[in-house]
Amino acid sequence: MKKKLAAGLTASAIVGTTLVVTPAEAATIKVKSGDSLWKLAQTYNTSVAALTSANHLSTTVLSIGQTLTIPGSKSSTSSSTSSSTTKKSGSSVYTVKSGDSLWLIANEFKMTVQELKKLNGLSSDLIRAGQKLKVSGTVSSSSSSSKKSNSNKSSSSSSKSSSNKSSSSSSSTGTYKVQLGDSLWKIANKVNMSIAELKVLNNLKSDTIYVNQVLKTKSSGSDTSSKDNSSKSNQTSATTKYTVKSGDSLWKIANNYNLTVQQIRNINNLKSDVLYVGQVLKLTGKASSGSSSSSSSSSNASSGTTTTYTVKSGDSLWVIAQKFNVTAQQIREKNNLKTDVLQVGQKLVISGKASSSSSSGSSNTTSSTSAKINTMISAAKAQLGVPYRWGGTTPSGFDCSGFIYYVLNKVTSVSRLTAAGYWNTMKSVSQPAVGDFVFFSTYKAGPSHVGIYLGNGEFINANDSGVVISNMNNSYWKQRYLGAKRYF
């Protein structure tokens, strides 16, 4: 009996795959245990779509012993092309590391993604750890000549523009080096900017950043910031109000109104980043006298009620913050935390008392939580069919944790973490409910894949087939299921 395998969702080694070269310069292989379309595409430097098309596949499920044609394996042509490229100029070689993307590598070596793909003969954006990429050298005579003309143009134009800009920008910009656990949201709050401003200032096309990346930031003493502050101070007398809509988050609202998330928190005396549909927020004006008096009273109280809390299994900063009626940011600052990942047994200093009146607000909390879950699931389903992209966090392509990051930020503000990172920050539950997160051990031990539970054994996730709805009772998922976690 043939054993079926779910495509693209395992990373065990391909052992003994049979390869036969045909006269037409195509290759055929026989599927072995552990093979998947994604893995074969990576091994033979093609794409899942090309494999599916070449073999007229109507499903991504493979059978052991099945014969597949590998498209476009023109070894002689590729070798001659590479040798000619080497002759034209000496190429540097870069080895892909875990977490890399073409965009990151192109930025690091001051290239465009298109140049990188041309230089390496790539037909897709998929790369794998350990893969060797050429990162310098001549792509073609036409591209090199265009580069020369562009460089001549850019050198003159950039020198003009930079000289014009330097007088105003040099004094008004600083730099920030990205640290482990950082996100654009966290950095924007740290340097009192909006995420949109950070992205424009650094020409970022996505929210993905990497450790040791240097970002330009606005100096607090710049002319622009003083202008903004003066205009804001003029506006404070007329308070603007905003009613929260489905899909909103503090980050989204802050960007729309050119504010920081922290400013909205302060003005509205928010204890958490959780919003609910219909909630009215003030968007201009000073933090209310009530909030300042309450903050002063809480600081007075906290000075006498500082407690040490030991992290338990299932805890997250958000869960602990709710328990002690403080914000996650207050816990971060109090404990100098560089990341939101907590360890069981870790000691945290908390200023405040565990809330005794949680039951009175439970009905409001339940209704707002339900609304957020519905919004999140709607946002997730709207992405059905979006292709898989390693490290992707946008509708142009997602990986599993990038998909979770995207949909969670439709209803709250979270950092970009791995599947294991989200596992460590959420509360464990014995059985998943709608809106909970289900985790699986796929290509390595521990949580390496995550999806959102929809009920009736189904969950939505981004796997190698793209964003799809899968069934947990499928033999592949059933044997790899780790457990469920709750965020809301």
Swiss-Prot record:
GO cellular component: extracellular region
Disordered: annotated span: 70-93, 137-176, 218-239, 286-306
Signal peptide start and end residues: 1-26
Gene3D superfamilies linked: endopeptidase domain like (from Nostoc punctiforme), LysM domain
Molecular-function GO terms, alphabetical: cysteine-type peptidase activity; lytic endotransglycosylase activity
Keyword Hydrolase: yes
Cell compartments where the protein resides: Secreted, Cell wall
GO BP: cell wall organization; proteolysis
Start and end residues of each NlpC/P60 domain: 370-488
Biased composition (Low complexity): 72-93, 140-172
Knocked-out gene: effects: Cells from an undomesticated strain (3610) lacking this gene grow predominantly as chains, whereas wild-type cells grow as separate individuals. They do not show a reduction in the rate of swarming motility.
SMART domains registered for this protein in UniProt: LysM
E.C. number(s) listed in UniProt: 3.4.-.-
Primary subcellular site in the record, as a coarse category: secreted
Catalytic residues of the enzyme: 400, 449, 461
Family: Belongs to the peptidase C40 family.
Name of the featured protein: Peptidoglycan endopeptidase LytF
Gene: lytF
